[in-house]
Amino acid sequence: SANNLASKIPSSKVYVMLAPTRLEFYGPEEYRTGSHSQQMGISTAYLALNPEVTGVDAYSEIARHTDEYEYFRTDHHWTARGAYYAYKAFCESAGLTCTPLDSFQSGKLDDFVGSMYRYTQSENLKKNPDYVEYFLPRYDVSAESFSTADMTDGKPLRVISTNITDESSKYLTFIQGDKPLIKMVSSCGSGKKVLLIKESYGNALAPFLLDTFSEVYVLDPRQESIQGMNIPSFVENNGIDTVLFCNYTMVPSNSKYMNALNTMIGA
């Protein structure tokens, strides 16, 4: 998909970031029998990329910080801290300046019990909740969500929501969860524009892009309700200079996601 898209938008740079999951770094040995190294899988996927597509080595940056709170225990996502290290790896790949994490104003929401509890109903998980750490954009930002590619039906959106009380919904802190299409505008002044193509791992990553890009577009191909989306045309019409695919390692085997994405890219 990335190779196909890159061939259609030669004036834009295309990057692919595959995010490892918690299991790669913290999974008990007895549960890893028969599972393949995600690092090896990521490397194999990147070898299939054409020269005009850059694979982002988020894995190594995340691996350097495994003593930090990079993944939730009760949920299948990475934390904002884990997403930051992936963002740092992207900046290095793209030749962009990455702001140190301690330069962002931060906060947290306590008592988050996520998807792993929902699947298992484990009392042990319930008794040991996570917290959701967030990092606020350093610049003035605004955001809207849309259901059409021409972006005529905008609804206001919060980039970071700091007041979510439902214990199972606190990952919605980041861009209010999964929307078909989002446009975010930052006063960072770079003049750069990026399209982030993602599933839910990208939600925690998206706010950091506002530190580097004046406009950040976020597309979730799983939300097939979006009308009229042709990604090459969208990139051209909006003057987007950078496209970043951010997905966790299992997404390439998700046929629904890949079919929707390929339809939006076109043959």
Q: For each of these PLM feature ranges, what is it?
A:
Residues 1-267:
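Extracellular glycan-modifying ectodomains
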